[in-house]
Structures are given as structure tokens and as C-alpha cells.
Amino acid sequence: MIDSAWKSWYRARHDQRCIASGDAFEDYATALLARLHSDYLNPAPMGKHGDGGCDGLADNGSILYACYGQRATTGVDQKTKDKLESDFARGLACWNGFSTWRFVTNALFGPLPTKSVLALRQQHASGTQRPITIEIWQVDDLWWKAADKLTPAQLDEVIPGVPHAENVELADLVELILSLEDVDGDGPDHIESIRPVPSTKMDFNNLPETTRAEFNAGRLLSARIDKWFSEQADPALRDEKAQRFRVIYQEARQATRDVREIVRRVYGALGGQDFDLSTKRANAVYAVTAYFFDSCDIFEEPPADNAGGEVRHVTTY
């Protein structure tokens, strides 16, 4: 499931998509509707009738959608009114089976289109010759009534951005990340086999307190990670990923001397740059990074005679 932080991220991207004008907004809206309805049909424009004022039919033809991405910069209210009336008239003439008409738009609704909607509702009220429910879906409606109803996979098809391994050579660890996200915190493996905190190595690499806290939280899942690697068909997978982590760390060190930036680059390679918008995803990324930190695969090992981290191998300046 997408947690509240990721839902906020998707909502922000939705609002950005809805700023687009013309076809860009209409394509976005129909992409959502096509996933909202399993029987959604969007006829291609043909001949003099075009698409018949139809941007989608759903629920066995009982719902007809018309989408309008605002194009006008002057006379906006009049043009929205004209578009609404034109699409409704064309839909009424071409499609005789619908009982609900939805006008999906990112245009502001001023007095003129509002009056048109009221007039059409009176003309097609219950008890008239052709009763039709007339609905206006604006940006908020499109979110709550369509986007918010989709599964995470469907939503990611329309608005790509669900966290993933940014580095292609770590992509097969996505399954591990997802398995760690499912940990509820109550299972026995959540408290067993916790690795001792290697404070000397953390001191030697001058890890900031925030990173230490992240690593310490991640270590609670180390037994899960051991178990996951032991269950993989390729016994060399763990060593292969350890080598890749080492390369990513070394590349980060070549780009910056700030240990916080280095850690962030390692996190991003594993979970994507926006990994921390999801609390569970962030904890899983911390866990895997701490796992390879503790097993000496990333960052530098202090000399054998280093007692307390007086030497600072990586600076934060």
C-alpha cells in the first residue's frame, strides 16, 4: 500500500498535471479514467462527427465522459461554456445509451458555464423525456473520484514515481526492499540477531548523528536481510551486490567529501531519490545500507589500533 507521504507526493504530481492545457490535460484525465473503469472505451475521431463529443464510455455505455483541457487565455468563461454545450449536444446526438454525463475539466467554472449546467439539468431532470445526470468534475473531483481510487500499480502507470532502485545493478534488491516494508515490527525476527553497533567504524568515517540513528534503526532488520539472501537461488548474489555497493560508494566519494552527501547517494542508488517520502521505504533502505556497512562492504575500515575514532577519514566539510 502507498502510505500517506506517498499519497501526498502523488497528489502534488496530479495538481501539476492538471495545470497543463489542451491535449496534455485531456490525455492525463483519460489515462486515469481508462484505469478507473474496466470497460472504458474511448472512440477515435472519425469523419465529420469526430469522436461524437465522447472522450470515454463506461459502465456498459451508461456513463459518457467529455474532457476539456483549458486552452483559452482570453474569454475563458465563454469558451468553457461553448465547449460544455457543444460536447453535450454532440454526445446527445451520437450516443443514445448514456444516463450520466461527466464533463471533466481543469477550466475555472464562472457564471456562464454554471448557468449552462443548471439549464441542462432542468432540461434533463428526472421525469423528462431524456433524464440525464449531469456532473462536473474539476481537479479535486478527478483526484478523489478517479486517481484516489486506483491501485498503486495503476497510479504509477499514469504518474511514474513509486520508489525503485535508481541504479540498475541494484534493481534485483527491490524485492528485498519490499519484503522489509512488510515487517510490522511485532515479529520475533524484529528483535533477534541484531548486529552490535560498530561505533569505531562510524567514528572513523565521521558519520553524523542522523545517519547513525538511521543505521541503528535499520540494524533491527538485519536478520530479515540474512534470511532473504539465504533464500535466493544465486548463492553469490550477496557478494555481487556488496561489490556493487562498494563501487557506488567509491563513485560518491569521488564526487563529494561531505559524508552526508555520500550516504544520500548510496540511499538514492538503492531506493530512488525520493525514497524518504515513504517511511517504510526509508527504513528498508536504511536497513540494507547498514547491513552492507556493518559487513565492511562500504565506507572505510579503521586501522586495527584505532581505539576511539580520533582519525576522521571522511570529512563533513
Positions of predicted regions on the chain:
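Charge-dense, extended regions
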Residues: 260-317
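Short, compositionally biased low-complexity segments
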Residues: 1-6, 235-239, 259
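Acidic-basic catalytic patches of nuclease active cores, encompassing PD-(D/E)XK
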Residues: 2-44
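Broad structural signal for hydrophobic residues in well-ordered alpha-helices, predominantly aliphatic
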Residues: 33, 124, 263-266
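Acidic metal-coordinating catalytic centers involved in nucleic-acid phosphodiester chemistry
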Residues: 89-251
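Catalytic centers of nucleases
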Residues: 26-30, 34-89
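C-terminal accessory/interaction regions of large nucleic acid-associated machines
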Residues: 247-255, 261-265
